[in-house]
Amino acid sequence: MNLFSALSLDTWVLLAIILVLLYRYGTRTHGLFKKQGIPGPKPLPFLGTVLNYYKGLWKFDMECYEKYGKTWGLFDGQMPLFVITDPEMIKNVLVKECFSVFTNRREFGPVGIMSKAISISKDEEWKRYRALLSPTFTSGKLKEMFPVIEQYGDILVKYLMQEAEKGKPVTMKDVLGAYSIDVITSTSFGVNVDSLNNPEDPFVEKAKGILRVDFFDPLVFSVVLFPFLTPVYEMLNICMFPKDSIEFFKKFVNRMKESRLDSKQKHRVDFLQLMMNAHNNSKDKDSHKALSDMEITAQSIVFIFAGYETTSSTLSFTLYCLATHPDIQKKLQEEIDETLPNKAPPTYDTVMEMEYLDMVLNETLRLYPIGNRLERFCKKDVELNGVYIPKGSTVMIPSYALHHDPQHWPEPEEFQPERFSKENKGSIDPYLYMPFGIGPRNCIGMRFAFMTMKLALTKVMQNFSFQPCQETQIPLKLSRQGLLQPEKPIVLKVVPRDVVITGA
């Protein structure tokens, strides 16, 4: 018997009602922007506009910016994303209304103890973490960490020298990723790991496990489509971060803390010690001021998660830009040689005060902002420049698109460090250049990241020149991943400075 004829009329009516209800549920928010005359790509039921992300967030945002203008609407599943590019609106969201409306970032899925991390936490909890952790990123504390980081700069130089002597091209992300992990694990936990020469060290393996989180993972994608699944996953103890890595760092932090509390000797400055000091110096250990062991673990892990990609990818992009612009590379080397004659060891002050080095790094971050986007969750109904934004929506700022807008940056695809010279820097609108965000919830580790990257660049530029080779992709193409990455790994020829550079 035919299945269709076997079903009664009542069954067909019931199925039709279910389908209509499912459609209504899957499109219930999709009329929000259309009613207000805000343009944007047409959303699909349940999916919204997320299928467009297969192009790459950066590319999709550029297409929308060119097609729709200053504002447009997107939907991550049911989640409305109101996209803004006007500097005054950006200022309202990231600064003026930060504490009252746009305090938090949106949830991306079940995160377990990482809900206690400064970059994920919300409202009063986030304010408390920010107040406790801000003193650990002062210039005084960073100066104390500088010698620790410098030793990994020396290891980096030694490794590159070995590769250069072999005449082999070097995959930048592999080498600079190892440098980043070494710096972050050392300054976060006080652990000396030479991951360039010990890639299978358990600490390195667990740190890399944290870094394998993919925002296009089916688990994360399911939460985008069905936000109500997040508490279900949390209840089932399902987490987007690898459990074995989380457990490893929890036990490690507890062991390190006990060891340091038992020991009377003075420990070197690292973030773990500074967080312990914040705990121990609190007048009332049960007060809101003290950091718990779980909170210390969460901050330590997020330093790895947030710091690795920014540092290693930005350094890779920088060396690519220098290799393909030998005149700029030569000018940077001249500044470094003049500031530090005869390969003198750098200091915190010399590294942070070199003007052309700062210009080169800022221009790289303009061309290649690793995060692509800034987002803030709307925690109550609000009107923003005449547009109604309901509670539960997200406001999104497309950093990559803003950094490549020819109205603000002439010849935006060209690598021109002079944009950030003393003469030109003052004319840059701070709400159009935000590689680390801006306002109260900007990246707390920005100064640390700059120090780490400037030190690495100083060390390698003192000793090497970089050239394109047969494996170098020119022009560089970007991948479709969530964070900004090259389509193919950046591979360059490393030439010791006593060898004449032949140009690109």
From Swiss-Prot:
<keyword id="KW-0479">Metal-binding</keyword>
<keyword id="KW-0560">Oxidoreductase</keyword>
<dbReference type="InterPro" id="IPR050705">
    <property type="entry name" value="Cytochrome_P450_3A"/>
</dbReference>
<keyword id="KW-0472">Membrane</keyword>
<dbReference type="GO" id="GO:0010468">
    <property type="term" value="P:regulation of gene expression"/>
</dbReference>
<keyword id="KW-0492">Microsome</keyword>
<dbReference type="InterPro" id="IPR001128">
    <property type="entry name" value="Cyt_P450"/>
</dbReference>
<dbReference type="GO" id="GO:0016712">
    <property type="term" value="F:oxidoreductase activity, acting on paired donors, with incorporation or reduction of molecular oxygen, reduced flavin or flavoprotein as one donor, and incorporation of one atom of oxygen"/>
</dbReference>
<dbReference type="InterPro" id="IPR008072">
    <property type="entry name" value="Cyt_P450_E_CYP3A"/>
</dbReference>
<dbReference type="InterPro" id="IPR036396">
    <property type="entry name" value="Cyt_P450_sf"/>
</dbReference>
<dbReference type="Pfam" id="PF00067">
    <property type="entry name" value="p450"/>
</dbReference>
<comment type="similarity">
    <text>Belongs to the cytochrome P450 family.</text>
</comment>
<dbReference type="InterPro" id="IPR017972">
    <property type="entry name" value="Cyt_P450_CS"/>
</dbReference>
<keyword id="KW-0349">Heme</keyword>
<dbReference type="GO" id="GO:0005789">
    <property type="term" value="C:endoplasmic reticulum membrane"/>
</dbReference>
<feature type="binding site" description="axial binding residue">
    <location>
        <position position="443"/>
    </location>
    <ligand>
        <name>heme</name>
    </ligand>
</feature>
<keyword id="KW-0256">Endoplasmic reticulum</keyword>
<keyword id="KW-0503">Monooxygenase</keyword>
<dbReference type="InterPro" id="IPR002402">
    <property type="entry name" value="Cyt_P450_E_grp-II"/>
</dbReference>
<dbReference type="GO" id="GO:0020037">
    <property type="term" value="F:heme binding"/>
</dbReference>
<dbReference type="GO" id="GO:0009617">
    <property type="term" value="P:response to bacterium"/>
</dbReference>
<protein>
    <recommendedName>
        <fullName>Cytochrome P450 3A41</fullName>
        <ecNumber>1.14.14.1</ecNumber>
    </recommendedName>
</protein>
<keyword id="KW-0408">Iron</keyword>
<dbReference type="GO" id="GO:0005506">
    <property type="term" value="F:iron ion binding"/>
</dbReference>
